[in-house]
Amino acid sequence: MATVIHNPLKALGDQFYKEAIEHCRSYNSRLCAERSVRLPFLDSQTGVAQNNCYIWMEKRHRGPGLAPGQLYTYPARCWRKKRRLHPPEDPKLRLLEIKPEVELPLKKDGFTSESTTLEALLRGEGVEKKVDAREEESIQEIQRVLENDENVEEGNEEEDLEEDIPKRKNRTRGRARGSAGGRRRHDAASQEDHDKPYVCDICGKRYKNRPGLSYHYAHTHLASEEGDEAQDQETRSPPNHRNENHRPQKGPDGTVIPNNYCDFCLGGSNMNKKSGRPEELVSCADCGRSGHPTCLQFTLNMTEAVKTYKWQCIECKSCILCGTSENDDQLLFCDDCDRGYHMYCLNPPVAEPPEGSWSCHLCWELLKEKASAFGCQA
């Protein structure tokens, strides 16, 4: 049968026991603070999802022990439910709002009155504001515990606590929810402007890259303008309304009719809007989209080579050997003709893309030392 130690200080020594209790308190406070930071979490020992609570006490809450062998006592704290109610939409309650300059008096015992939901509504403060202030207060409390040094004297620590608490309460009381919401909306708008820098001059729609903006111009505004011109001329053929999927137009023989404008600069063969000079268009054999070689960043060898076969754009690109577009991450493009090859379809197969320029066997036979990969590829 275990014996009860009525006075543990005599068995272990006064200083040793105080240091052990202090280390235990510091460890527990840090552990609870770290758990509160990553809440909610699943306790691996009990299998219970832990939530934040109000059972953790501070040094300033300590009281003298009342029972034999009891070192400290802590005041009991009533359980309170976390309020997450939204203010009602009844316009009658909004007429009873009080000016924000008016503040409710404090209780005589020095603690602020715990307002009900109705009192918060009458003061013009949402319940969400109280919840946010309480959460901010708990987060600051956690950060203060984590940053607190274990070797700080107890007297200095209590003075810091007494100085920090009123500052924190004043800061949360004077915080305006409208300004925070406006700042969040402004930050979201600036983030969207940064992510989508390309803006349509006609409708104001934003895109992440220039090809997306060009596609929007071509298939939204340009298509509507062409439709209006066709109605004015009263042509027999109805205007073609292109959808976002870009269905290619086919002629009587089944071949795709190419577009007469560049998908990047929206210029025709008579003028490249980027360079201001006339330039011939290169069209995809599958979807009919067109582009200037300079807009496509083609080399001289590419510009001449794409005229000799049915060129495909990057969205329609398929392997020349197997004829499929599957495993597009394995496609390797020739730097002289822009043909696509699966790395596992090559003879011999290639495990990784080669460094530098790469030319296919057709361009090696045709260009020889003029190939882009001459001197780089064995």
UniProtKB/Swiss-Prot annotation:
Organism in which the protein naturally occurs: Homo sapiens
**Classification of source organism:** Eukaryota, Metazoa, Chordata, Craniata, Vertebrata
> What is the name of the protein in this document?
Zinc finger protein DPF3
Q: Which gene encodes it?
A: DPF3
Coiled coil ranges: none
List zinc finger spans: C2H2-type. 198-221
Sorted UniProt keywords: Activator, Chromatin regulator, Isopeptide bond, Metal-binding, Myogenesis, Neurogenesis, Nucleus, Phosphoprotein, Repeat, Repressor, Transcription, Transcription regulation, Ubl conjugation, Zinc, Zinc-finger
Q: Which family does it belong to?
A: Belongs to the requiem/DPF family.
UniProt-reported outcome of changing residue 358 to E: Abolishes binding to acetylated histones H3 and H4
* Cellular compartment(s): Nucleus
Q: Name one GO cellular component term.
A: nucleus
In the UniProt entry, what is the domain comment?
A: The PHD-type zinc fingers mediate the binding to acetylated histones.
Cited SMART domains:
PHD (SM00249), ZnF_C2H2 (SM00355)
Composition bias of kind Basic residues appears in: 168-186
Question: Where do Acidic residues bias regions lie?
Answer: 148-163
What is its quaternary makeup? Component of the BAF complex, which includes at least actin (ACTB), ARID1A, ARID1B/BAF250, SMARCA2, SMARCA4/BRG1/BAF190A, ACTL6A/BAF53, ACTL6B/BAF53B, SMARCE1/BAF57, SMARCC1/BAF155, SMARCC2/BAF170, SMARCB1/SNF5/INI1, and one or more of SMARCD1/BAF60A, SMARCD2/BAF60B, or SMARCD3/BAF60C. In muscle cells, the BAF complex also contains DPF3. Interacts with acetylated histones H3 and H4.
